[in-house]
Amino acid sequence: MLDFNKIKEVAQGYQADMTAFLRAIVKNPGESCDEKAHVETIAAEMKKLDFDEVVIDPQGNVIGYMGTGDKIIAFDGHIDTVGIGNINNWTFDPYDGYENETEIGGRGVSDQCGGVVSAVYGAKIMKDYNLIPEGYK
């Protein structure tokens, strides 16, 4: 098993990729019942990261698997957002967002697309470093 500091170091190496992935999700509106662009962006990233299986179910959920066992380790997160309201109330384009050394802003970044991005890359790190227990996916 890797120690936490090594895992953190590996994760920091993906910071630019994770930031680009999050910004790609945010670029598209994703209001409830209209998240198709978010789903497709997440599925494409999972495939790029060599998930063992990527499924978009009939309800439009994207499900990615790392590992091939019968037991499941799951992270569940929503990717829909609320509307932007009056665009004139924003100090930046909520779909273009902004980024500086410490923050990324945009519609859905903190609720909850950023968490989904972290989970996708967390699964990649788990697979790359053999941290998925035998019998799990």
What is the predicted role of each segment?
Residues 2-109, 128-133:
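Acidic/His- and Gly-rich active-site-bordering loop/insert found
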Residues 112-137:
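Acidic/histidine-rich catalytic neighborhood of metal-dependent amide-processing enzymes
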